Amino acid sequence: MMTHWPSPAKLNLFLYITGQRADGYHTLQTLFQFLDYGDTLHIEPRRDGEIHLLTPVTGVENEDNLIVRAARLLMKVASESGRLPAGSGADISIEKRLPMGGGLGGGSSNAATVLVALNHLWQCGLSIDELTTLGLTLGADVPVFVRGHAAFAEGVGEILTPVNPPEKWYLVAHPGVSIPTPVIFKDPQLPRNTPKRSIDTLLKCEFSNDCEVIARKRFREVDAALSWLLEYAPSRLTGTGACVFAEFDTESCARQVLEQAPEWLNAFVAKGVNLSPLHRELL
């Protein structure tokens, strides 16, 4: 029985904000790709119906943690539909590698891994579509991790079209700050009217991120990290930050630059992959 479950990072290879809805949510067009790097969840089934998170996150109550919320949500929905075996529970711990507030999707990925893993371990039998619907109630980025394939996303991020962008090597750098998403989306100078384009058109254009100008303006650490990376390769912000990344055609090129990273920059090299490491384990 599989007990170690990948919870990979994602990059937004581009991100354009096309509008803002009446409810305040922003509409966007973005390209998600996974990394062969991320957190690992250790999940051991229990038979007493209890959910225990054995590795609490500092400053976050266990019941507010997306890991616990995802487990309880699956338990509730599967139980209500008669698909939860009696006594289903779990002990969950996490090896955390992805920073909070980094734009790598760590929390969303954790939630998706819990949904997929417990659906498998508990033998609930929910479909990917059902798990995706549950995931969306936990966060806009959760569905892409549930589905497990690189995707072009529209709407608020929930309308997904599978795509296969080139699987490049990336140097990903965390500049030592955490950026809450609302800080970027509430900034009055954030571009909110980028014209919508087809995926075919977008893939032919130079990639960029509408959030980057705000992140660089408000966080000098992000600006410094991007300024350094841009000396070596095409680089940009992922999500709303704070992580930034540079793309390379080979691992050796990426690692050569990594060796020159300044001490204040926490960085790693990873491969972009179109099939999530989580789903690769299930094949």
Swiss-Prot record:
<dbReference type="Pfam" id="PF00288">
    <property type="entry name" value="GHMP_kinases_N"/>
</dbReference>
<keyword id="KW-0547">Nucleotide-binding</keyword>
<protein>
    <recommendedName>
        <fullName>4-diphosphocytidyl-2-C-methyl-D-erythritol kinase</fullName>
        <ecNumber>2.7.1.148</ecNumber>
    </recommendedName>
</protein>
<dbReference type="InterPro" id="IPR014721">
    <property type="entry name" value="Ribsml_uS5_D2-typ_fold_subgr"/>
</dbReference>
<dbReference type="GO" id="GO:0005524">
    <property type="term" value="F:ATP binding"/>
</dbReference>
<feature type="active site">
    <location>
        <position position="141"/>
    </location>
</feature>
<dbReference type="InterPro" id="IPR013750">
    <property type="entry name" value="GHMP_kinase_C_dom"/>
</dbReference>
<dbReference type="InterPro" id="IPR020568">
    <property type="entry name" value="Ribosomal_Su5_D2-typ_SF"/>
</dbReference>
<dbReference type="GO" id="GO:0050515">
    <property type="term" value="F:4-(cytidine 5'-diphospho)-2-C-methyl-D-erythritol kinase activity"/>
</dbReference>
<dbReference type="GO" id="GO:0019288">
    <property type="term" value="P:isopentenyl diphosphate biosynthetic process, methylerythritol 4-phosphate pathway"/>
</dbReference>
<dbReference type="Pfam" id="PF08544">
    <property type="entry name" value="GHMP_kinases_C"/>
</dbReference>
<dbReference type="GO" id="GO:0016114">
    <property type="term" value="P:terpenoid biosynthetic process"/>
</dbReference>
<feature type="active site">
    <location>
        <position position="10"/>
    </location>
</feature>
<feature type="binding site">
    <location>
        <begin position="99"/>
        <end position="109"/>
    </location>
    <ligand>
        <name>ATP</name>
    </ligand>
</feature>
<keyword id="KW-0067">ATP-binding</keyword>
<dbReference type="InterPro" id="IPR006204">
    <property type="entry name" value="GHMP_kinase_N_dom"/>
</dbReference>
<comment type="function">
    <text>Catalyzes the phosphorylation of the position 2 hydroxy group of 4-diphosphocytidyl-2C-methyl-D-erythritol.</text>
</comment>
<comment type="pathway">
    <text>Isoprenoid biosynthesis; isopentenyl diphosphate biosynthesis via DXP pathway; isopentenyl diphosphate from 1-deoxy-D-xylulose 5-phosphate: step 3/6.</text>
</comment>
<keyword id="KW-0418">Kinase</keyword>
<dbReference type="InterPro" id="IPR004424">
    <property type="entry name" value="IspE"/>
</dbReference>
<keyword id="KW-0414">Isoprene biosynthesis</keyword>
<keyword id="KW-0808">Transferase</keyword>
<comment type="similarity">
    <text>Belongs to the GHMP kinase family. IspE subfamily.</text>
</comment>
<comment type="subunit">
    <text>Homodimer.</text>
</comment>
<dbReference type="InterPro" id="IPR036554">
    <property type="entry name" value="GHMP_kinase_C_sf"/>
</dbReference>
